[in-house]
């Protein structure tokens, strides 16, 4: 028995798509939500939002992360360097995910060397810790983008509907009388 096909009255989910026309509203929403300016472009803004969220994640979870590095390439690092490696790996990965989901070309913004810290997280526990930080950080941003883009599209659709629902009647004329004229 399979429950993967659409039912008779099922609706397909609306998957938002970032387009250039969304740039200003998306940048403004990110600035309002995360207090990070978009003056240097959306890619830079996303990277700085990612850095802010990853810093918050590290601040809340650093003790747990430092406690699971045994057996990984991070073993032997002091707390400061574990934190630097974690933040670098999480920021670049989160930014990559955000740019990729928005249809931007992450390869235009990153080089191979930017991802080298990711390879230090080579045990199941360290991979899980890094993955959780990336997932939680990118989810916060992507949910904000989803809300912003959906609202923008609804407003655009409402404006379009409103302009098409207007009558093209001249106010002084009105509708013509459909009754036959008396003889």
Label each residue range with its predicted role.
Residues 182-183:
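Short acidic DE-rich linear segments
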Residues 1-175:
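N-terminal accessory/interface modules of nucleic-acid-binding and processing proteins
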């Amino acid at each position: 028995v399979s429950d993967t096909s659409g039912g008779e009255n099922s609706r397909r989910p609306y998957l938002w798509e970032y387009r250039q026309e969304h740039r200003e509203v998306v940048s403004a929403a990110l600035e309002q939500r995360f207090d990070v300016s978009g003056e240097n472009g959306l890619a830079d803004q996303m990277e700085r939002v990612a850095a802010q969220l990853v810093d918050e994640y590290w601040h809340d979870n650093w003790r747990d992360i430092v406690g699971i590095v045994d057996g990984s390439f991070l073993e032997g690092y002091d707390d400061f360097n574990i934190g630097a490696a974690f933040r670098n790996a999480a920021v670049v990965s989160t930014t990559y995910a955000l740019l990729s989901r928005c249809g931007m070309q992450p390869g235009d913004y990153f080089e191979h060397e930017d991802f080298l810290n990711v390879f230090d997280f080579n045990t199941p526990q360290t991979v899980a810790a890094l993955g959780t930080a990336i997932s939680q950080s990118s989810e916060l941003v992507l949910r904000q983008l989803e809300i912003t883009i959906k609202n923008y599209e609804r407003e655009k659709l409402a404006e379009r509907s409103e302009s098409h629902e207007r009558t093209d009647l001249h106010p002084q004329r009105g509708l013509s009388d459909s009754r036959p004229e008396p003889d």
